[in-house]
């Protein structure tokens, strides 16, 4: 469903940037779906995202939840015919051979039951900190936070950042809108907003040991820092 076609333009801030709060509200008003998905537009979603959500919904282990996943960065240079099984198989093979899993802080989508996130702060789209808030807030209210990364492969089509009028550092971290998002989020929530409390793998759905979750974050910290250090030079 396209909110723009069914609902019209969502609310914007003074700089004309869309508000996530209005988009989430519009989605809840327009759809009676059990689960809503927010996803960045530069990724390729494969069918096992939906089958994974169906598995969790049928599980007796959790009721309400929020699921998330990291992306796999890949240079996609040719158009893909998803109606052709061979083309999809080739993509998956390319992902396996050449794809690079993004750092632990890079969440590419959120899927949550309709009873959650009905009212959120007025975060703006495309700036930092709101995504960390989603997971940190869920944890603060005891909502299961499920990491789909190991099972669900989400392909991020590598691109430049020429659409930005400034650096990635300004857009995501130091700019006015990023700082406003940070204020609304009550901080950056980097650790709590980048890890789950449950994991979905080929072996099923299981609750994580917090010691392992924290270890996973700290083990990936060097890659996160390398990414941030590149921000001032990426336009």
Model-derived features: where do they sit?
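Conserved beta-strand scaffold positions in the cores of enzyme catalytic domains, especially
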Residues: 6-8, 66, 145-147
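C-terminal catalytic/acceptor-binding lobe
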Residues: 123-235
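Active-site-proximal specificity loops/subdomain of glycosyltransferases
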Residues: 4-39, 46
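Short, high-confidence coil segments that cap the C-terminus of an alpha-helix
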Residues: 32-33, 61-65, 143
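Conserved catalytic core of nucleotide-sugar-dependent glycosyltransferases
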Residues: 44-136
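Preference for well-ordered, secondary-structure-rich cores of eukaryotic proteins
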Residues: 21, 38, 102-105, 154
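Short, solvent-exposed loop/turn segments at secondary-structure junctions
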Residues: 12, 42-44, 72-75, 117, ...
